C-alpha cells in the first residue's frame, strides 16, 4: 500500500533519502507523470487514480479516473503516455470494459472464441478529452507497455505455464499491438478440447522469447546510449534476472526483431525501468517479498559505433527497404482510419488489400471489413475471383458464426486448388473448415466424405515435395499445420486419417506431435488395426514421462479416459497386455529372475573377442525387454528416451565397450545422465534423477529415487534445499545382467550391435 519516493544526490549515483507517501493506493503496478500530476494504476484497488504529491511528501487532489472490475492476479499493469494518449495494459484477470468506451477491435472476433472471453487487453485514454478506447485484445498477462517513436505500442506477453509441453502451449513473446488486433489468447480451463490460441485471424508475434517471466518493456531514443541500444526495445525478465535488448527493423507494415542479452545479474529480479535526467537507465528490482534495489546503467560512451562501409548495392537495398516499409505503413494507417470511422464507402480497395503479401496489411484489411455491417461486404467476398481475397474475406464471414454462410463457404472451399496455396493460405483454408464445423456441423456432415478426402490430400507429406520437411509462415509451421489437420479430421470421424496420424504424429520424436495425435483420435471408434491401437495405448501408458506444466497430466488423463471409452470389447481383449501393464513391468521382470552370477567383464571375454558377435538377435530383443533396457533407452520406435538412444549404439561402441557399459555403468557417465544428490536443511539426502518440469517456476522439485520405478517419485520444497550437486553415479543400476546366463548375454550384445 502507498508509494515510495526516492530522492537522488546531485551526482545521480546514490539515493539521498527515501520517503513513504501514505496514500490508500494498493499495489501500484503502473506510474506515469503528466502535467505535474501522477497517474497510478492501483491493481488491488482496481482503479486508475490521478494525484499530486507536494514537497512535504503528502498526497493531494486524489481523483478516481476510472474503475476496472475483475480479479487482481493478472491485473491492472503498466502505464505510458505517447502522442496525447495514456496507454494502460491489463492482464486477463481484468474485465474487458464495454461501457463508455470505443472498442476498436472486431465485433465478430468473439464468435470464433471457445469458452471464456477473459483476455488481456490494451486500453488508451485521450488526455485532452477523457475518451477511452479498447485498442486491442487477446493477451494473457502483459505487464509492460512501450510505444515506439513511430506510434506502435509493444508488449512482452507472458505464457500460460499450465499448458507447457502441449501443442497448444504458447511461449512468452514480443507483440506489436496493432490497432483493432486480437492476439488470440483467452483464459481456458483444463477441459478437452483445449483452446489453440494462435489462429490465422489473430495477430502473430514479432518475436518468441521462451522461458521467462515478463515484467516491464521500455524504449526511449533519449537514452544516452550508443546505437543500436539507443533505439532498442528493452525487455525485463524477472525469473532469469536479465534484461534483453530487442533490435527492431521495419518489415513491411510491421516489424522483424532480434534479441540479445543486454544485462544479467545474480540476483537481478528486475521489475521496472526508466530513463533518468542524465540519460542513464534506472532499473528497480524486487517483487514477491524479495530485496528491492535501484540500479543505474550508464554507457561508458554515448558515441555511436562506426558502421561498416556499405556497398552501393547494400545502400540501395536499405533505402528500398525503408521506402517500401513507409509505403506499407501508409496502407496500414489508411485501413486503420477506415476501421475507426465505420462509414459506408467504396470497399474494393479494402478487398484488394486482403490479398496483400504483407500479413499486417491483410490483418488490418480484414478488421476494417469486420467492423462494417456484413450486408455491405458479404456479396463482394462471395463474388470475387481472387482465391486469396476470398479466403481472408471468408475468414471474416466465418467468424460471425452465421449458419446461412456455411453452405456457400463450404461449396467454394471444396473447389479450391489448395496445391497452389502457400502455407499462410493453407492455414486459413483449414481454419475455414473448422469454423464451418463449429457454426453448423450438419452442413459439413452432408459433405463429410468429400471434406475428409480434401483435407487428407493436403496432409504435408502427401502434397509437398519430399525435400520440404519444414516451412515457416507467420501463421505457423508445417508441423503445426499437420497437428491442426489431425484435429479437424478427428472432428469429422475420419477413419482413413488413422494411418497418417500413426505414421507422422504417433511416431514423431516431438512430444507435441504425439499429444496432438492422441487428442485428435481419442473418440475414434472405427478404422483401427491392432497395431495402431497398441501404438495409441503404448503412448498413453508412457505419458507420465512427458515433460510439461501442471496441466499436462490432467490433459493426458482426460485423453486416456476418452480413448478407453472408444474401445470395443474385442479391442480391449486384443490389447489387454498393454492396457493392464504396470509402469514398473520391466523392472519387475528383472526382479522376478533368480541370480545367475555377479558377472565381470573378464568372465565374458569370449563373447567380445570378435568385432561382430554371433547370436540369436530375436532372443536378444526379448532380453532387451526383460533386462529393463527399454525402461530408459530407446531402440528404434520402442522404449523411452531417459538415457542415451541405443538404436545405433553398435556404430559407436565395439562389443567389449558395450558390455563394460552395461556391467559397470558408473565407469563413465555423461553429465546430462548423472544422478543428483539433494541435501535438505533437515539433514536428509535424496539421491535420484531430477525430473525436468515444464513449469520451472514451481516451488517444488520432483526427484525419481529409483530409475526403474516410475512411482518412486518424491517432491521436496525448493526453499528447504541446503545443497545440490551431481553424483558420479549412473542412474543405471549395477547387476542388470546378473539374472541372465552367458548365452542370453551374447544374444543381447548381438541384438544391440544389429537390431532386428
Task: List where the protein language model places each region.
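Beta-propeller domains with acidic blade repeats across secreted/periplasmic ectodomains
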Residues: 1-337, 636-637, 717-719, 727, ...
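C-terminal capping alpha-helices of c-type cytochrome domains
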Residues: 38, 595-596, 606, 663, ...
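Long, ordered, helix-rich scaffold segments
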Residues: 286, 290, 299-623, 642, ...
Amino acid at each position: 500500500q502507498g508509494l515510495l519516493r526516492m530522492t537522488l544526490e546531485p551526482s545521480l549515483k546514490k539515493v539521498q533519502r527515501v520517503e513513504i507517501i501514505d496514500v490508500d493506493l494498493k499495489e501500484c503496478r503502473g506510474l506515469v507523470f503528466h502535467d505535474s500530476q501522477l497517474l497510478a494504476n492501483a491493481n488491488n484497488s482496481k482503479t486508475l487514480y490521478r494525484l499530486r504529491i507536494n514537497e512535504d511528501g503528502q498526497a493531494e487532489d486524489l481523483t478516481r479516473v476510472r474503475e476496472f472490475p475483475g480479479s487482481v492476479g493478472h491485473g491492472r499493469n503498466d502505464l505510458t503516455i505517447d502522442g496525447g494518449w495514456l496507454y494502460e495494459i491489463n492482464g486477463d484477470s481484468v474485465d474487458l470494459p464495454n461501457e463508455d468506451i470505443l472498442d476498436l477491435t472486431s465485433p465478430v472476433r468473439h464468435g470464433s472464441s471457445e469458452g471464456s472471453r477473459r483476455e488481456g487487453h490494451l486500453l488508451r485514454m485521450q488526455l485532452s478529452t477523457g475518451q477511452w478506447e479498447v485498442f486491442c485484445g487477446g493477451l494473457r498477462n502483459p505487464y509492460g507497455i512501450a510505444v515506439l517513436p513511430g506510434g506502435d505500442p509493444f508488449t512482452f506477453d507472458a505464457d500460460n505455464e499450465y499448458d507447457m509441453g502441449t501443442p497448444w502451449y504458447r511461449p512468452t513473446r514480443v507483440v506489436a499491438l496493432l490497432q483493432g488486433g486480437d492476439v488470440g489468447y483467452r483464459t481456458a480451463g483444463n477441459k478437452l478440447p483445449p483452446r489453440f490460441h494462435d489462429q490465422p485471424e489473430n495477430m502473430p508475434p514479432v518475436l518468441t522469447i521462451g522461458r521467462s517471466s515478463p515484467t516491464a518493456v521500455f524504449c526511449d531514443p533519449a537514452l544516452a546510449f550508443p546505437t543500436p541500444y539507443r533505439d532498442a526495445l528493452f525487455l525485463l525478465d524477472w525469473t532469469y534476472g536479465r534484461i534483453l535488448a530487442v533490435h527492431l527493423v521495419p518489415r513491411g507494415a510491421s516489424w522483424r526483431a532480434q534479441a540479445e542479452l543486454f544485462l544479467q545479474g545474480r540476483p537481478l529480479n528486475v521489475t521496472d525501468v526508466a530513463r533518468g535526467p542524465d540519460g542513464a537507465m534506472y532499473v528497480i528490482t524486487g517483487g514477491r517479498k524479495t530485496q528491492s534495489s535501484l540500479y543505474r546503467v550508464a554507457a561508458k560512451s554515448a558515441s555511436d559505433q562506426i558502421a561498416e562501409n556499405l556497398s552501393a548495392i547494400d545502400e540501395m537495398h536499405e533505402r528500398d527497404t525503408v521506402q517500401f516499409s513507409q509505403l506499407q505503413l501508409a496502407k496500414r494507417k489508411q485501413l486503420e482510419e477506415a476501421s475507426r470511422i465505420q462509414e459506408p464507402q467504396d470497399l474494393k480497395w479494402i478487398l484488394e488489400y486482403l490479398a496483400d503479401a504483407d500479413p499486417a496489411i491483410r490483418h488490418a484489411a480484414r478488421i476494417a471489413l469486420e467492423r462494417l455491417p456484413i450486408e455491405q461486404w458479404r456479396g463482394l467476398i462471395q463474388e470475387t475471383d481472387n482465391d486469396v481475397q476470398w479466403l481472408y474475406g471468408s475468414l471474416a464471414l466465418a467468424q460471425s458464426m452465421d449458419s446461412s454462410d456455411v453452405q456457400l463457404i463450404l461449396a467454394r472451399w471444396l473447389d479450391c486448388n489448395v496445391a497452389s496455396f502457400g502455407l499462410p493460405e493453407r492455414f486459413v483454408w483449414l481454419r475455414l473448415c473448422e469454423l464451418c464445423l463449429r457454426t453448423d456441423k450438419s452442413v459439413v456432415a452432408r459433405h463429410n466424405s468429400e471434406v475428409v478426402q480434401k483435407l487428407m490430400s493436403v496432409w504435408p507429406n502427401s502434397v509437398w515435395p519430399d525435400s520440404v520437411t519444414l516451412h515457416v509462415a507467420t501463421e505457423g509451421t508445417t508441423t503445426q499445420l499437420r497437428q491442426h489437420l489431425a484435429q479437424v479430421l478427428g472432428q469429422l470421424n475420419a477413419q482413413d486419417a488413422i494411418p497418417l496420424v500413426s505414421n507422422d504424429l504417433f511416431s514423431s520424436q516431438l512430444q507435441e506431435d504425439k499429444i496432438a495425435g492422441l487428442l485428435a483420435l481419442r473418440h475414434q471408434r472405427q478404422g483401427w488395426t491392432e497395431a495402431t491401437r497398441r501404438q495409441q495405448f503404448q503412448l498413453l501408458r508412457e505419458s507420465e514421462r512427458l515433460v510439461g506444466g501442471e496441466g499436462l497430466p490432467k490433459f493426458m488423463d482426460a485423453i486416456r479416459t476418452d480413448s478407453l471409452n472408444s474401445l470395443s470389447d474385442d479391442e480391449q481383449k486384443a490389447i489387454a497386455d498393454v492396457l493392464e501393464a504396470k509402469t514398473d513391468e520391466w523392472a519387475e521382470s528383472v526382479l522376478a529372475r533368480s541370480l545367475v552370477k555377479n558377472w565381470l567383464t573378464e568372465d565374458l571375454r569370449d563373447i567380445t573377442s570378435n568385432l561382430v558377435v554371433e547370436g540369436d538377435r530375436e532372443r536378444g530383443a526379448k532380453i532387451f525387454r526383460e533386462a529393463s533396457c527399454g525402461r530408459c533407452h530407446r531402440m528404434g520406435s520402442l522404449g523411452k528416451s531417459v538415457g542415451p538412444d541405443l538404436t545405433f549404439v553398435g556404430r559407436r561402441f565395439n562389443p567389449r565397450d558395450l558390455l563394460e557399459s552395461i556391467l559397470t555403468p558408473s565407469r563413465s557417465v555423461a553429465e546430462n545422465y548423472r544422478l543428483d544428490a539433494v541435501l535438505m536443511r533437515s539433514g536428509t539426502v535424496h539421491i535420484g534423477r531430477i525430473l525436468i518440469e515444464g513449469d520451472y517456476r514451481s516451488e517444488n522439485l520432483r526427484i525419481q529415487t529409483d530409475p526403474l520405478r516410475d512411482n518412486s517419485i518424491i517432491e521436496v520444497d525448493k526453499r528447504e534445499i541446503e545443497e545440490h550437486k551431481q553424483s558420479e553415479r549412473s542412474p543405471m543400476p549395477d547387476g542388470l545382467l546378473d539374472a541372465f546366463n552367458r548365452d542370453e548375454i551374447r544374444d543381447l550384445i548381438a541384438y544391440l550391435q544389429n537390431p532386428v
